[in-house]
């Protein structure tokens, strides 16, 4: 988890609107989501617990987790899902199981860049962050 710990600033997002639409997110929330460039803050809380916080001018959301343990999460677009995060071969993998859809998010760090690849059905979104100061 060490490479993921820190503050990350979103630089670009490709394909996010299509993912949100597929997940049933309403038009207004999708438009707001596309305008936001949130900071992602990943913290080590100790005892194997971590916190992930997404902060923007419009909305802040966060959750705490232990790797390999399922938990309830309310996503930034207000969907209730069961989530689980694991690390495999340097990839922070997250599975979000919702009522109708399952979403997969793979986060990988390349130097000072974090790339999050979001998949829902055949749709793919890539969100790129740079390490903050």
Curated annotation (Swiss-Prot):
Family: Belongs to the calycin superfamily. Fatty-acid binding protein (FABP) family.
Gene3D superfamilies reported for this sequence: 2.40.128.20
InterPro entries hit by this protein: Calycin, Fatty_acid-bd, ILBP, Lipocln_cytosolic_FA-bd_dom
Pfam families attached to this UniProt entry: Lipocalin
Residues involved in a fatty acid binding: 107, 127-129
Domain remark from Swiss-Prot or TrEMBL: Forms a beta-barrel structure that accommodates hydrophobic ligands in its interior.
Natural source organism: Echinococcus granulosus
Keywords: Lipid-binding, Transport
UniProt-recorded Gene Ontology molecular function terms: lipid binding
Keyword field contains Transferase: no
Name of the gene this protein is made from: FABP2
Functional description taken from the UniProt entry: May play a role in the acquisition, storage, and transport of lipids, and may be important to the organism since it is incapable of synthesizing most of its lipids de novo.
Name of the protein described by the UniProt record: Fatty acid-binding protein homolog 2
């Amino acid at each position: 988890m060490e490479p993921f710990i820190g503050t990350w600033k979103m630089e670009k997002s490709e394909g996010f609107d299509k993912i949100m639409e597929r997940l049933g997110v309403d038009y207004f929330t999708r438009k707001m989501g596309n305008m936001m460039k949130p900071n992602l803050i990943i913290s080590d809380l100790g005892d194997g617990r971590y916190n992930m916080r997404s902060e923007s001018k419009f909305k802040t959301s966060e959750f705490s987790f232990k790797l390999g343990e399922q938990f309830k999460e309310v996503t930034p677009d207000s969907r209730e899902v069961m989530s689980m995060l694991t690390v495999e071969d340097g990839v922070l993998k997250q599975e979000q199981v919702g009522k109708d859809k399952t979403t997969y998010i793979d986060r990988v760090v390349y130097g000072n860049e974090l790339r999050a690849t979001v998949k829902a059905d055949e749709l793919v979104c890539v969100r790129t962050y740079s390490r903050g100061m």
